[in-house]
Amino acid sequence: MAKKVLPTVLALILLLSACGSRLPSPTGTPAHQEPSPTVAPTPESTPYDGPVSPLSGLPMGKEWVNRRPVAIMLNNLKEALPQLGQSQADVIYEVPAEGGITRMLAVYQSLDGVGKIGSIRSARPYYLELALGHDAIYIHAGGSEDAYAKIRQWGVTALDGVNGPYMSNSENGNLMWRDPERRKSYSLEHTVVTTGTSIIERLPTYGLRLEHEDGYRCQMNFVEDGTPTGGAEAPRITVPVSHYKTGVFTYDPDSRGGDPADGRKVKGATIHWVDAA
């Protein structure tokens, strides 16, 4: 009896094994599936917590904190264009002057990366008042008799390229010089220039007060994200001054700045129009 049982059991095991090894027939060719792309997580930006310029609200180096800004007289005659360095100023004042012309006062809180600046022109009393409002070091080339009198009377820290020891006949030979390239095609009064590097290197050698006095506070305030608090959109502003000059300021939404005469974008500059009565 035992001999009959064993073959039966073995046959049953073989049958079960055969049934278990049979695979179902494929019903069709499976479609090729592309692997899902891996989406990299968006890195979180670290909020800037360093010093910002009190004149523009933009980041600046720690070495400029509490430093007096530099206010430079800039030529604005058509014959003197293009201007140099105005696009890197923190604040630009364009003020009507005599004869229907205007001149600009460019105020720089930080001079990092600022290249050639010019052409530098002469002082007038109303620009002195603007410079004093910022406790700025005033750089100019010449001036009216009234301006020279006010510089002495008001105690303006003024560096004069015409009647002072700040002019050189050679490039980078002093705080200011007459640009060799401009001298080839411009009148002499349109050739005085300086650079951010020259100002940085030479100001400490003049024995001037370079920092604001205790208690000084800048009167400008800026919203943290740069969003305007009110008003209408103004992509283009036209300011008629006289038969000679009409100021035009065009806003570039890509760079969030204006398009100045030298072809560079104004980055973060604050442009004030002051009508001198």
Give the role of each language-model region.
Residues A2-K3, V266:
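Generic cytosolic/nucleocytoplasmic N-terminal low-complexity/intrinsically disordered segments
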Residues G20-G28:
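Bacterial lipoprotein signal-peptidase II cleavage site
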Residues L6, L23-P24, Q83:
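Short N-terminal micro-motifs specific to bacterial/archaeal maturation
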Residues G28, P35-Y93, E98-A277:
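A surface/extracellular/periplasmic glyco- and lipid-processing/surface-interacting theme
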Residues L16-A18:
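C-terminal motif of bacterial Sec signal peptides marking the signal peptidase cleavage site
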Residues K3-A11:
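Sec-dependent signal peptide recognition
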Residues L23, Q33-E34:
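Positively charged, low-complexity intrinsically disordered regions
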Residues K3-K4, R22, R68, R103:
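Basic side chains
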